[in-house]
Swiss-Prot record:
This is NAD-specific glutamate dehydrogenase. It holds the Pfam family NAD-GH. The keyword Endoplasmic reticulum does not apply. It comes from Achlya klebsiana. Transmembrane segments: none annotated. It is an enzyme of class 1 (oxidoreductase).
């Protein structure tokens, strides 16, 4: 990704650099696209009539400044992100009354626009006449550029405006006189591209160019190709500025006019300064030129508000000559006219006007129509208009008054003292330059241009460079990295995986309907087709309700048929023969009756009704096990732990092909007097009889204690029924767990229901059965599903249909159930066949829903190997990366005055070192080789201390200081919905459950002493743990009444103590 960002930045810079010549030639400047577009939008919103007026001007063909503003804004908003908009009056041959209206609208609404520009808006305007705005330059900068304008200068610029109120409003604007100015009204001080480098390199460039001209002046073969002819007539001297042929090809017209106008303005200003020093001004002999709609300087300069009387010390005899100066501009040409109104005593005279234009040929035409060629290189010396006075006026009776431009350039800054060189009439012959000199001059011209434009790219102002870097980084990281790689990439993956998802708002509806992820639609089909519990009958009417997830291989296929919402929570399982199914449906339970639960301060039992796998005959493949009603979670394994006495008694089979049962119990010296046992009475009774005679489901008045819980396995004999039912109703076993209803405190009971079908009818010590599935003596099994942690069981119907069932094997350990379940929301999960890393785990839900993506959560647990020899097995292999059990004890004390960190473990069955797993997509950018430590949590989850620290209660920062461990520290939090509790969390990183039981701290037991939510730590100071026993507490679940799909925010302000509302 970093490489892509770098390439994008390089590409972006190259694009800008490739267009830098175009940008510079158009006198455009870099500006933020967001500011510019927002400014334009607000401008047009504030001036809708201006927008409409601009359309009318474009339709009428008036290429005035308003139309240029309108068209250029629309073009740049559509195509460019970075630009500076410069509006030039391309054609001023029309009446500009509408332009004046546009200027009023623009200035009137400018205070409304300026606050939305997100930065100082430098608005520079050349007001060259009283009724027309000739140039409007909108420039956006990342920093302020103070032109040092005074109120008097601003008033001088605004004074010709016909709207005095508007001028006063602009002058008195508070923004105008602060450091962060939004509005500037001043004359253009820098021409073209040199505006960008004025702050840094303008002076240096000017000196270098001046030095270059001085060198060229001394070269005899590179004399300026400047030729003038003797003036033989009286009349008008006109300077005609025409396009250079190359300029017409490479430069757009609006740039040409902008450059010409600004340059001519600067030149004429200097001319007027010279004229005013030599002429006597008279105010009563002015002759305006109303027919010329051009650069009307009469109202701009005081010198042109009066007649210009010729006079001075140059030997001219008459003092009554008047001179009028005006401009006339068309789309292609600009004419500069100096008219001698009354020249009775002037035989000849001329004014040489070197008009400085970049990359153009300035042709000076006098009344004799003799051309004068001026090199375009002269433009390069214009680096500051206000410090360059390079035009001189030379007159002499009956001779041409002229000088070389090099002489004028050499006298920059001192035009009044430079002495021109006069030519005689014989010298005034046309002299064409040689071809080699022209080629060399063009070559030098291109070299200078390349040097200067290269300097522009390098020597930009720091503010502009900073803006460019910041904007490019924002574009790269936000537009490219975030939008392209994250948003679009993930969206594309999601679009491929989840093409058909029907969802509603979980907060409004209460649950989400999904065709694939949840089982509401599937369960509805079950209801329609007769799918029901506790009723004798064939639930699979058309043989497809249990085939939501079918694999390609019969050993790994699973059929899911969920009958209710049963939280299996902290039950255990093994790793062998895991399935590859993905995204099972989730049952939505609308409500329950009132149930009497066990108080949280008391011990609860793990009630498990499973059929353990009987590894009869010690074969590798024991086919499919018989239906067993055993409650012994140790099943056929001798799980041995420290100071525990797990008894297991083999019971003879009543009938070889009917029932295989095991009677297992946990004789651990628990406080209660009841074992986890099997009630076989219901096996010989019909379902209806048991329900009518034994169950009392309607008495809700009294409370129950530990012995009032009834666990019945209901079923029916199937010895003879299998011979007749065939397709309609093969023998089935229905297991019912009934709660005696009542009001009272709610405890937690974990009920795991599993039903099996006896396919293992082999007669000898063989590995596979060959005849049992073809005798129509079995029925499709139904069972719960734990994704990725189940044993696939093969079931064959008589009709030949393959249906897979999920069988859960449970292995108990001594105490403390570590979890590595897959009960997490907001996770994109792909279950694969793998080891389950966790000896004791929790089954949160039968069906897990994955909704939101972009959160990587690992729910891998681990357990011991599934071995062939069932008589001598110890669950010794653990779940850490290097192989050991996942039992850790973390202790956090209550007070935090003098807290220290103990780097040793209280009791650990894991390896000493193991690598951290990347559980959350490397959000914290940290992977370390860490220890499993015992924390003295006085400092609230601080892993190390230096001295006596005081730590606020809720000041927890999830940064690199919070190190995430593997499943040895399996603490997580689950978003609670209704009465579904959020599991305990330590720093809120992993998404794995952590079971906590309350016991006395004695020797010989493994007790976890930390309880915590997202930001608070809950400590059980008084615990109760006995010696040499195995007791499983499940203080972490409740009935799931609204576990549809709603998300609720965890309580972060919960008090740091254990309450009955801990769910």
């Amino acid at each position: 990704m970093l490489l892509c960002i770098v390439l994008f930045l390089i590409f972006h810079i190259l694009i800008n650099q490739a267009g830098i010549v175009h940008v510079l030639y158009n006198a455009s400047f870099v500006a933020s696209s967001s500011r510019f577009i927002l400014f334009c939008e607000e401008l047009f919103k504030a001036t809708p009539q201006y927008w409409q007026w601009g359309n009318s001007i474009v339709q009428n063909g008036d290429a005035s400044i308003a139309s240029t503003l309108y068209l250029t804004m629309r073009t740049f908003i559509k195509h460019w992100k970075y630009t500076l908009l410069i509006m030039i009056n391309q054609s001023i041959s029309y009446s500009c009354y509408s332009t004046n209206e546009a200027s009023h609208l623009l200035f009137t609404n400018l205070p409304k626009v300026a606050p939305y520009t997100l930065g100082p808006l430098n608005f520079e305007c050349c007001l060259l006449s009283s009724h027309h705005i000739r140039h409007i330059v909108l420039m956006f900068y990342g920093a302020n550029i103070d032109h040092g304008l005074t109120k008097y200068e601003l008033y001088t610029v605004c004074r010709p405006s016909s709207d005095e109120k508007l001028c006063n409003k602009i002058l008195n604007s508070p923004r105008l006189h602060t450091h962060n100015r939004y509005l500037y009204l001043t004359e253009v001080r820098i021409v073209g591209a040199f505006y960008l480098i004025k702050q840094v390199g303008a002076r240096m460039v000017g000196l270098l160019v001046h030095l270059a001209f001085m060198v060229l002046q001394n070269l005899p073969k590179l004399i300026w190709p400047l030729d003038l002819v003797h003036v033989r007539q009286k009349g008008t001297c006109t300077a005609h500025i025409a396009y250079h042929p190359l300029a017409q090809k490479h430069f757009p017209p609006y740039f040409t006019h902008f450059y010409l106008n600004v340059t001519i303005y600067a030149v004429v200003k200097n001319i007027l300064d010279n004229i005013s020093s030599s002429f006597t001004l008279q105010s009563n002999r002015v002759r305006p030129r109303p027919d010329v709609a051009g650069f009307d300087f009469f109202h701009r300069f005081d010198a042109f508000e009066q007649s210009l009387t010729y006079g001075g010390d140059t030997g001219i005899t008459s003092s009554n000559e008047k001179v009028a100066l005006c401009f006339e501009a068309t789309y292609t040409d600009i004419f500069f006219t100096v008219e001698i109104i009354d020249s009775t005593s002037v035989d000849s005279g001329a004014i040489m006007l070197p008009i400085l234009v970049d990359a153009y040929t300035a042709v000076a035409r006098n009344f004799c129509s003799v051309s004068m060629v001026i090199s375009p290189l002269v433009t390069l010396v214009v680096y500051d208009i206000y410090t360059c006075s390079f035009i001189g006026l030379c007159t002499q009776r009956r001779t041409i008054n002229c000088t070389r431009i090099l002489d004028a350039i050499s006298s920059v800054g001192n035009s009044h003292t430079f002495l021109p060189r006069y030519k005689s009439p014989r010298e005034l012959t046309t002299r064409q330059p040689s071809g080699s000199s022209v080629i060399l001059l063009i070559f030098l011209l291109l070299g200078f241009e390349f040097f200067l434009f290269s300097g522009l790219v390098v020597v930009e102002p720091v503010n502009d460079v900073g803006d460019l870097v910041v904007n490019d980084l924002l574009v790269a990281f936000i537009d490219l990295a975030l939008e392209l790689f994250v948003v679009e990439g993930v969206a594309e993956v999601v679009g491929v995986v989840f093409k058909t998802v029907l969802g509603f708002n979980a907060d409004v509806v209460g649950f989400i309907f999904r065709l694939v992820l949840f089982s509401f639609l599937h369960h509805a089909f079950n209801i329609i087709l007769g799918e029901a519990t506790l009723v004798v009958g064939n639930g699979n009417l058309v043989f497809f309700t249990s085939r939501l997830f079918d694999g390609r291989h019969v050993q790994d296929t699973v059929g899911i048929n969920v009958e209710g919402d049963i939280n299996l929570w902290n039950t255990t399982r093994h790793w062998r023969n895991t399935i590859e199914g993905e995204l099972p449906e989730q049952v939505v339970v609308t409500g329950h009756r009132t149930l009497t639960f066990k108080h949280l301060n008391q011990h609860t039992r793990l009630v498990v009704s499973v059929g353990g796998e009987s590894l009869r005959l010690l074969g590798w493949h024991s086919s499919v096990t018989l239906d067993e009603g055993s409650h012994d979670t140790t099943s056929s394994f001798q799980t041995k732990r420290e100071r525990s006495d797990i008894k297991k008694q083999q019971v003879l089979e009543l009938f070889r092909r009917v029932v295989t049962a095991q009677n297992g119990s946990l004789d651990c010296g628990t406080e209660s007097n009841s074992f986890i046992r099997v009630d076989r009475l219901a096996w010989f009774l019909a379902v209806e009889e048991v329900r009518k005679q034994l169950l009392d489901l309607w008495d809700t008045g009294g409370t129950t204690d530990k012995d009032d819980f009834m666990d019945l396995a209901l079923g029916e004999l199937r010895v003879t029924e299998d011979l007749f039912n065939r397709f309609h109703s093969l023998a089935e076993v229905v297991t019912a767990h009934v709660f005696e209803t009542g009001t009272g405190d709610g405890g937690v009971e974990i009920n795991t229901i599993e039903e099996r079908v006896d396919f293992n009818v082999s007669l000898g010590r063989r590995r596979k059965s060959t005849l049992g599935t073809f005798t129509s003596g079995t029925k499709t099994a139904k069972g719960t599903l734990v994704l990725g942690h189940i044993l696939a069981v093969l079931a064959l119907e008589f009709s030949g249909k393959v249906v897979d069932e999920a069988v859960i094997e449970i292995f108990t350990t001594q105490v403390g159930i570590t979890s590595s379940s897959l009960d997490f929301e907001d996770t994109f999960f792909n279950g694969q066949k793998r080891h389950i890393e966790g000896t004791t785990t929790k089954i949160e839900n039968e069906n897990i829903a994955f909704t939101t993506l972009l959160v990587k959560t690992v729910g891998n647990g681990g357990t011991s190997r599934f071995v062939n020899d069932t008589k001598d097995v110890k669950t010794s292999n653990g779940t850490s990366i290097l192989g050991s059990l996942t039992l850790r004890v973390v202790e956090i004390s209550w007070d935090g005055n003098d807290s220290v960190v103990n780097s040793s473990t209280n009791e650990g069955f894991s390896n000493f070192l193991h690598l951290d797993q990347n559980h959350r997509g490397n959000f914290f950018r940290l992977e370390s080789l860490s220890f499993t430590l015992e924390f003295d949590g006085d400092l609230w989850l601080v892993t190390s201390t230096r001295g006596n620290l005081e730590w606020p209660v809720l000041n927890i920062g999830l940064s690199s200081w919070v190190v995430e461990f593997t499943t040895d520290q399996t603490l997580s939090i689950e978003h609670s919905v209704g009465r579904v509790h959020g599991n305990l969390v330590l720093s809120g990183i992993t998404n794995k459950t952590f079971a906590v039981s309350e016991s006395n701290v004695r020797w010989g037991g493994t007790v976890t002493l930390i309880v915590g939510n997202n930001f608070n730590t809950i400590v059980l100071p008084d615990t109760d743990t006995r010696i040499s026993r195995t007791e499983i507490d499940t203080d972490g679940s409740s009935l799931d009444t609204r576990h549809a799909c709603s998300k609720f925010k965890n309580e972060v302000d919960s008090p740091p103590h254990l309450t009955s509302a801990f769910i």
